[in-house]
Every structure is written in C-alpha cells, then in structure tokens.
C-alpha cells in the first residue's frame, strides 16, 4: 500500500520539525498524527482515534478545533513542548490537488507571544549562551516586548547561574559542545527547555544579521563571542517566528558589576520575588512593593528588585522622585487613575511587529495613547530631575492616535478577516462596497415582505447559511399556500421546505461578491495601517518604558506612605546605620503595631561584625534578613522601613540563612553550608554585606565551633575583606571574642524569663546572650511535660559537673584555657564541649516526631553519654 498524498505532505513537513508537535491544518481542525497524536492525547486529554493514510494500520490521530488551537498549544508549551503550526496556504475550494501547507510559526516556551497565556507582570525571556576563549557571552530577549539584553564575563559557572536566576528564562539556546557539567547544573537548578546548536550556527552571517536587525549595532562595543551569542539567539527567534521582528531593534548591553550582586542562595533566602515555602508572590518583597497600575510597571518593578543599583547618582534620582511623589498626594492619585486605563502597550507593540495584532487591540492602543497628554501634563507639575526628564522624553504619540481614531471602528470584529474593522469615511472604496452590500440586504428584506403578501404566508422567511446561500423557507403546514411554479425546491427538512428563485440567486451573487470584496479590502487596509504604525514602534516602546518607570515611582510612593517608610541617606563611607528598622514583609503579616523595631549600627572599620546570640525562635534570622532587605530597598531607590537610615552602597549581598540541603545531588546539609560559606569568603569584598546564620551547626560541636571561630577571624582580620557582617550563632563561647578581635561586638535578642517560661522581646541589645533557653523553647513547641522535667534534670546535672574554664582563668575574654608553656596557643576543654553537644542535641530533638519507646531510648542515650564524662 502507498501512503496517501496528504500524509506524504504531513511527513515531509514533520521531517523538518522533528522536535515539535505538529499541528496540521485540515479544514476546520488542526490534526496530529502518529507519536505526536499519542503525546497530545495524553497531555491534553484528547480522544485518540485513527485515520486511513495508505498504510496497513490506521495512523493514530487526534485533533482540536482551529479557532481554539491556541488554548491547546499553550498547554503543551507550558509543559515544555514545542508546537509547529502548519497552516493551509490557499483556499481549499480553489486548490488543484492537495492543499498547499507549511509551518507558519513554531511556538516554544521562550518565544510564545500570546498575551492571553503570558503572565502580565513577568517577562518571558529566552537566553543564549556562547563560551569562547574562557569568556562567557549571554543574551536575554523577550520577544513579547522587544527587549534584548547582552553581557559577557569571565567563564565562571556561578556567575552564569546567577544571571539565569535574575532573568528566569523559559528557554535556552546553547552550543553543542558546551561543558556538560554546566548544562547539568542548569538542569538541576532551573525548570527550563534548552536547544543545542553548532558553533557555526552562532557564527554564520553574524555581522550581516546583526546589522540588519539592530539599529544601534555599530554603536555597541561587541567582542566576537558576544556577536556570536546575539546572532545565535536572533536566528533562533526568526526561525521560530518565521518573520522579521522589527520591534527587537536595540541592543541593550550591560555590565554585571554595574548592579548589586545577589547570588542564587541569597536571592532565595531574602525571598525577593517569591517565597521559599510555596514559591508564591505573596509574602515576598515584591508583594509588598508592587502597587503598580500597569502590566508594564509590574514587569519593571520586578527588574528593579532583581537588579539593584550601585550608582549613588541614579539611586538618588529615584529617591528624589519618590519623595516628591510622596508629598504630592493628589497628583500621585491622579496619575494612578490615568495609568490604570493604560493597556500593555509594550506587548501591543510586539504584536504589531509580529503582525498578530487584531483590531480590538488597536482600539486598546488608541485608548492608552489617548491618556498620554494628560499624563504628560500632570508630570509637568514636578521638579525632581527624574520626573522632569520623564516629562521631556514622553512622546504623546498624537499622530498615531489620530490615525487610529480615524481608521478603526470603535467596536470592531475580533478577527481581521471578518470585516467590520475600518471606520466609515476612512476609505472610499470600502464605503461604496458597504453601500452595495446594504442595498442588497434591503432588497432581501423587501423580497421577504413581498412574498408574504403574495402567498399570504405570514411565517415565510428569507434566510442565509454558508452552505446554501440565500433561500426562502416555508413551514410544512403552509405548503398548500405556495403558488405552483413560483419557487424552485432546494431542500426538504422535517418541518419545512426551502426554495430559491433565479432573482434571489442573482442578488445573492451581488451581495456575496460585495461582502467578499469588502472583507478582503478591509483586511488589506488594516494591514496598511498596521505597517504605518510599525514604522513608529520605537516611539511607542519609548513611551511605554517611561510609563513603566513612572508607575514604579508611584508605587514606591504609595508603599512609603502606607507603611511609614523613610528616605534613606545614600553614602560611600562604609557605614550602615538604621534607626528603628523593620522587616518590610513580616510587619505586614503580623498584627498591626506588634512588630518590634530594631537599630543597626555597623561599618567596615571599627564595627565590622555584629555577633548575635539568643534562643531559637527569638528572631535572629528575621532581623538579619531585615537588614539585608533594607539595604537592597535603598539601592533600588525605594524608601525603607525605618525612622532613619544611612546606607553605604554595597556591591554584593551574601546570606547563609536556613538549611538548603541538596540531597538529590548527594550533598549533606553541612557540605552545602560549607560550600556556601566558602563561596561567600572567596567572593565578598570590603563593600559587601554578609549575613551568616548558625555557621557550623551541621557537624560536631568541636568542628562547628572551630569553623565558626575561624570564619569570624577571617572576616574581621583580613585586610582584603573586613566587610559589614551579621553573624548569628548558638556557640556562646564566641561571645568572649569581643575585645580580642577588633571590630567584633556582641549583640543578642532580649528574652524575659518568668519562672519556667520565657517571653521573646524581639529586641536587639548590645550584649551576648546569658543562656540558650532551649528547654523553654521546647516547652513552647509542645513537648510532653515529663520530657521537659527530665531534660531539666539532665541539664542541671551537666551544669553542676561543668568544669571551670574561662570564668576562672586569666583569659576570661576568650573563654579558653591557656596551655603552658606555649604562649598564645589555646586548648578547648573537650569534656565541656561534649556536654554542650549533648545539650544542643537535646534542644534539637524533635520529640513530637517520636513514639514513647523512641523517647525513652533517646533519654537513655543522653544519660549513657553523660556518665562517660
């Protein structure tokens, strides 16, 4: 048996798109065959059938209606599949033989542009990576907005991973020979689709391609590696979209060092855009700061949070604008009301460029542009430099508004191929065809009245459908009234008969001819209008960018007013002074007024490190995150949750807070912790901020204390480091280092003890903690009373057996015993540390997860170990 001609056509197209699920247009459906059908049936829950194709067995098949294909395609794309859309390229009724078909677009996670299925306030990036001569070039594009960013840096896996984390691309374009270790790291950390191409793919015709695509190509300093990287990405985009995209016309080169660096772990620990627990926006810093009114503003504020500034001049421009907006409440409110009426013109510009915009979206663009003069007039009332610059640069796009107002119907059809999109009076030929169509329909209405009078059949109707055209319909109960020979029978139905007349068919040809010509002419005129606007895409994008930044300034002002934030003073002298600082997120989720504010005073000279002790649950981690977030907020140009703040610009923020086991990679808690600490110590500079929580807790007491002690010394004593650090620990022995290590000062979370209960005061005080209060915390957690009683007995026994160490030696400040005759050498009392280890394990024991037998066994183990001391 031979394969049918249509199936041969299908297989030929599929051969060129092996990595895609092929949507093959057949009449009113898109059909999928063979393995594609099986995958689509499973993923989309479609009925799997079969189709005769000339083979011995029927080809597995499933299909979706053509008008709803985008819904099904988006579901596949969201699951990481690529979808190739093969369209009919000619009218089937006019085709000679098999209808011509070909792929008109390939839908992929990183190139999907249908705004119905994209997150409004999140960019949809696709990334390319090209490594050459130990230099990594990276490009990030969002074809829905026209954004194209590029940078390069030394070959460092962590830097690459950090950039991927900032942009969160949905798809990657990589070299075939890229190091598999890097590819594995990317796959482990990110849910992303990737494609691999030869080096030749990246390099081929790069100068010609980039010159043709980007208007500023000649002005941007690009290495050969960066050119290859950009070329590979733009080629892939054009290959999938099957058309040139004129709105992607500006290369935006940036330097990584121009922004505050926050690595992946720190970004996660600080919960900048999503929470650690459930990856939701609610509970993140973005959730607090995002009061934007437009989708463009929502995307922009996310970018600002992901890429804080280190240029004090740019930071102060934003802060001054926020301050002025904050003090002019009425103008701010008026601006917000106008911005709420602005659609996502950034993505509308992208749809114009990709020729996928419809007439209703053109009306949305017109309505948005209509608000620009009023917005421009309002901004004119401000005097801060940034807002003045915005007013001067904002193009009100008056000529584009005029064109859209004169040309597009106020309530047009959704499809641009159904007519009713061009406004009356804009095009003479369209008006004449509409008149002809209108006269024809008037004739039809007149015919219906005439035939009713002639026949006496009041229910007689002249109707239309696409199969039979116009016809006269008479119910069977009235057939006896039909004059003989007046009509030609066309169709018999259960309850009626349908007839035609030569005159009716003649008028039908005139009406349908006018309608076909009208629809085609309206479509062509719409395309001309679209092309005229496409030439002004850069102006539209420029105004969209200004509106997005203005929206962010309004949002920052709202948040500052609502939460009583202060304007930080930006400095360069290394100081960090925060008066009555608060955690921006935590204070929003607890009862109003219950958050305890705390001061922070630190620098990178004589007050380098805050050594913070105190019981678990007292608030050490919250306090440290609070400081990190306040610094970051200041550097994005936002007011901060404090009564006053002096913030010296940081180049990097590092955090080591909370467990982050990578068990799938075979790494223990302690191994991950040590890797993170190592990364921090190797990459921090004098201008960095380090937040370390419980370093050393993942190993034995001896090792943990030694490592924590050594890390403290390294940070405080290293001339190349000595940066601002908050170091929380449960090792109380370390508090004796104050006075021994220059720049280290003790702090603790205040606790009030009432009988056997404790009250967390949440207040940072300048002294070390007196004790751990582990058993009291265990009581709060709900451990059985008999376990708590026994724990107190064991603790009392341990404390009574505690050897004399630092308190009864000359070296009281370091909590160590000097060993003779070696001067300046130290020896730790290992029996004491073993007791501390038992105590720590007792505090960390999750009694609620154990049965009574396990509890008794655990207590027996503690007693056995204690007796050996």
Curated annotation (Swiss-Prot):
The keyword Zinc does not apply. InterPro entries: DNA_mismatch_repair_MutS, DNA_mismatch_repair_MutS-lik_N, DNA_mismatch_repair_MutS/MSH, DNA_mismatch_repair_MutS_C, DNA_mismatch_repair_MutS_clamp, DNA_mismatch_repair_MutS_core, DNA_mismatch_repair_MutS_N, DNA_mismatch_repair_MutS_sf. It comes from the Bacteria. It holds the Pfam family MutS_III. NCBIfam families: mutS1, PRK05399.1. HAMAP family: MutS. Belongs to the DNA mismatch repair MutS family. This protein is involved in the repair of mismatches in DNA. It is possible that it carries out the mismatch recognition step. This protein has a weak ATPase activity. This is DNA mismatch repair protein MutS. It comes from Clostridium acetobutylicum (strain ATCC 824 / DSM 792 / JCM 1419 / IAM 19013 / LMG 5710 / NBRC 13948 / NRRL B-527 / VKM B-1787 / 2291 / W). The gene is mutS.
């Amino acid at each position: 048996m031979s394969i049918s001609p249509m199936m041969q056509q299908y297989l030929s197209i599929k051969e060129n798109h092996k990595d895609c699920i092929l949507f093959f247009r057949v009449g009113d459906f898109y059909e999928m065959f063979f393995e594609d059908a099986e995958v689509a049936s499973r993923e989309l829950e479609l009925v799997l059938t079969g189709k005769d194709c000339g083979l011995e067995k029927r080809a597995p098949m499933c299909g979706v209606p053509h008008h709803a294909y985008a819904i099904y395609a988006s579901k596949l794309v969201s699951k990481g599949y690529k979808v190739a859309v093969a369209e009919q390229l000619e009218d089937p009724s006019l085709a000679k033989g098999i209808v011509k078909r070909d792929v008109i677009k390939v839908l992929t996670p990183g190139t999907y542009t249908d705004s119905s299925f994209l997150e409004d306030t999140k960019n949809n990036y696709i990334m390319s990576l090209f490594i050459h001569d130990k230099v990594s070039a990276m490009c990030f594009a969002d074809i829905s907005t026209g954004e194209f960013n590029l940078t390069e840096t030394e070959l460092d896996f962590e830097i690459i991973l950090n950039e991927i984390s900032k942009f969160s691309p949905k798809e990657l374009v990589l070299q075939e020979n890229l190091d598999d270790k890097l590819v594995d790291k990317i796959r482990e950390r990110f849910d992303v689709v990737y494609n691999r191409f030869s080096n030749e793919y990246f390099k081929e015709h790069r100068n010609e391609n980039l010159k043709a695509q980007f208007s500023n190509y000649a002005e941007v300093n690009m290495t050969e590696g960066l050119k290859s990287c950009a070329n590979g990405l733009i080629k892939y985009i054009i290959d999938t979209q099957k058309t040139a995209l004129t709105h992607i016309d500006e290369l935006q080169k940036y330097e990584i060092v121009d922004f505050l660096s926050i690595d992946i772990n720190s970004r996660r620990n600080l919960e900048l855009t999503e929470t650690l627990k459930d990856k939701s926006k609610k509970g993140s810093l973005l959730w607090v700061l995002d009061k934007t009114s437009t989708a463009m503003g929502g995307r922009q504020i996310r970018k600002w949070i992901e890429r804080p500034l280190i240029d004090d001049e740019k930071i102060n421009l934003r802060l001054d604008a926020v301050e002025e907006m904050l003090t002019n409440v009425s103008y701010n409110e008026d601006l917000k009301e106008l911005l709420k009426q602005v659609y996502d013109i950034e993505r509308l510009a992208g749809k114009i460029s990709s020729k996928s915009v419809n007439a209703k979206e053109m009306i949305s663009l017109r309505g948005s542009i209509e608000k620009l003069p009023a917005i421009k007039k309002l901004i004119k009332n401000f005097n801060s430099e940034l807002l003045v610059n915005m007013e001067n640069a904002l193009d009100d796009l008056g000529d584009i508004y005029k064109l859209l107002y004169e040309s597009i119907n106020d309530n047009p059809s959704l499809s641009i191929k159904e007519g009713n999109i061009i406004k009356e009076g804009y095009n003479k030929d369209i008006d004449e065809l509409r008149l002809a169509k209108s006269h024809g329909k008037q004739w039809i209405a007149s015919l219906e009245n005439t035939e009713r009078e002639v026949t006496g059949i009041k229910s007689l109707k002249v109707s239309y459908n696409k199969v039979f055209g116009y016809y006269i319909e008479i119910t069977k109960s009235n057939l006896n009234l039909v004059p003989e020979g007046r009509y030609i029978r066309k169709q018999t139905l259960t309850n009626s008969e349908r007839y035609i007349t030569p005159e009716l068919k003649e008028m039908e040809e005139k009406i349908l001819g006018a309608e076909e010509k009208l629809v085609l002419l309206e479509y062509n005129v719409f395309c001309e209008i679209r092309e005229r606007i496409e030439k002004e895409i850069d102006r539209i994008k420029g105004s969209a960018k200004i509106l997005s930044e203005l929206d962010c300034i309004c949002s920052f002002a709202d948040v500052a007013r609502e939460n009583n934030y202060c304007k930080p003073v930006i400095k360069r002298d290394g100081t960090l002074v925060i008066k009555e600082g608060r955690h921006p997120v935590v204070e929003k989720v607890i009862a109003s007024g219950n958050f305890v504010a705390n001061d922070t005073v630190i620098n990178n000279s004589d007050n380098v490190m805050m050594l913070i002790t105190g019981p678990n649950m007292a608030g050490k981690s919250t306090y440290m995150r609070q400081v990190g977030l306040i610094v970051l907020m200041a550097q994005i140009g936002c007011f901060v949750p404090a009564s006053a703040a002096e913030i010296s610009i940081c180049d990097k923020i590092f955090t080591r807070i909370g467990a982050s086991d990578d068990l799938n990679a075979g790494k223990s808690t302690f191994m991950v912790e040590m890797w993170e600490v190592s990364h921090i110590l190797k990459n921090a500079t004098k201008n960095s901020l380090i937040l370390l929580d419980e370093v050393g807790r993942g190993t034995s007491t001896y090792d943990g204390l030694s490592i924590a002690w050594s890390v403290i010394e390294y940070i405080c004593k290293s001339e190349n480091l000595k940066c601002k650090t908050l170091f929380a620990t449960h090792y109380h022995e370390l508090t004796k280092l104050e006075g021994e290590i220059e720049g280290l000062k003790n702090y603790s979370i205040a606790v009030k003890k009432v009988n056997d209960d404790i009250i967390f005061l949440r207040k940072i005080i300048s002294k070390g903690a007196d004790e751990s209060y582990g058993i009291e915390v265990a009581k709060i957690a709900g451990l059985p009373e008999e376990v708590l009683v026994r724990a107190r007995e064991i603790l009392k026994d341990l404390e009574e057996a505690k050897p004399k160490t630092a308190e009864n030696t000359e070296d009281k400040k370091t909590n160590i015993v000097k060993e003779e005759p070696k001067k300046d050498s130290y020896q730790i009392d290992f029996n004491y540390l073993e007791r501390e280890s038992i105590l720590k394990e007792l505090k960390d024991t999750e009694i609620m997860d154990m049965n009574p037998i396990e509890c008794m066994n655990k207590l027996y183990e503690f007693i056995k170990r204690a007796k050996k001391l």
